[in-house]
Amino acid sequence: TVSELAATADGMAEVVRPALEMLVGRSFTDAGKVAWEKLEGADANGIRRTDGMVRNATHGEEVAVTLLEPDARQGDVVIWLGDRGRGSLTDADGRPVAAVARLLAAGTAVVGMDLFRQAEDPPARNRAVREDREAAAYTYGYNHPLLAQRTHDVLTVLAALRTGQVGDLGRPRR
């Protein structure tokens, strides 16, 4: 079974990882050439907030990113994926939600991102072709599914983090 294969290093390397890469349409090593652009930053209550964009030149993609860093940062970084994208990091008053606040208090930086079609005002429906011969094959046959596109966004941000491009984080220790 898949769970038995995933429990071994050989099973992961030979079966599970290639299967996931096939489903997603991209591997970590194929994430592409990425660049970080800082858009704005602010410090408040011992937390530095940096908003920026990670651009993937190889695949023509960009991901909006928010980085929250505590003043007493210990070096770890958590990637925070939520239903509201970067908005999942904070409450309506702009304060970090409880779980994010605990991470920051422990000295951990937190990175949130707006995944594909996850911005504050996502479209109400999937796009459709405006012709008599509408066919889902044109939308879904030529494009990766939503899960794969969002996974591409995570891989793009991971690539930027691993190269030390996001904020002032530097290269990871591991």
Predicted segments with their positions:
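Non-catalytic accessory segments flanking enzyme active sites
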Residues: 1-67, 148, 156
